[in-house]
């Protein structure tokens, strides 16, 4: 197996790494064997040249091997974004997760604190009263009893502590911004992943295919959102039955109206928590509609809906019946017990 120095030398020439070489390099970094200089050199060389599907696949395989796993039902789904889109939007995937859970599909939500906004999934859930820093068996209990559990990334990826300081010092996006959403500790086979750039939509779908995902949508809004947007089209790469299909979707085809970007602007964790609760309480808003649209796509990925329109109808029922709000109440109770 190539040593780290020779791998860094190879990347420095612009040559791609094999999946095995990438896995070897990331194992060195995450096990603490690599020096900060070596980590910085490799991460920036990959970033400047552009990471390949094989390199990301190798890196994710190491991250998955080192994570602390959570037991979840085989049909569990995740709705997750890379963050880093710079939009400062409301917490779309978190709200959509409660809608999906309210529709009877188990959700194993993976997330972290804010990356570029003022409120990430962990921030808003903590503001709502959910205990986020749980052990894997406690998260599994949440999924079983509340129909939804939250896996706080730092608690499930302890090996990341070895690369954390280097990432902070680099202060720029690296391959690790792509790895987290692909490394769900519950090992979900069905997920919706939002990405910060259109260039990653199809490659990340290919990575998920390489790693054995059953069904997935990788999405990027035309306005830059790492979610399905309500302001215009969204680019999608869908993994279905071992094949990847690319297409665009619009809110109109799901029976929803367009909004401007101001309608999706968020605030800090406290403000976003109030906004999320108001959606679960049934109040109409662009936030409700964008959460419904993302939930609808997740319901399609989960096999619960055949189309976005049907997914929106199921999502509306989850909200209007109080089921989605009930899932949040249950998660607060179970996570704190």
Swiss-Prot record:
Pfam family for this entry, one: Glycos_trans_3N
Domain of life: Bacteria
GO molecular function: anthranilate phosphoribosyltransferase activity; magnesium ion binding
Binding site for 5-phospho-alpha-D-ribose 1-diphosphate: 81, 84-85, 89, 91-94, 109-117, 121
Keywords: Amino-acid biosynthesis, Aromatic amino acid biosynthesis, Glycosyltransferase, Magnesium, Metal-binding, Transferase, Tryptophan biosynthesis
Enzyme Commission designation: 2.4.2.18
Matches recorded under Gene3D superfamilies: Nucleoside phosphorylase/phosphoribosyltransferase catalytic domain, Transferase, Pyrimidine Nucleoside Phosphorylase, Chain C
Protein name: Anthranilate phosphoribosyltransferase
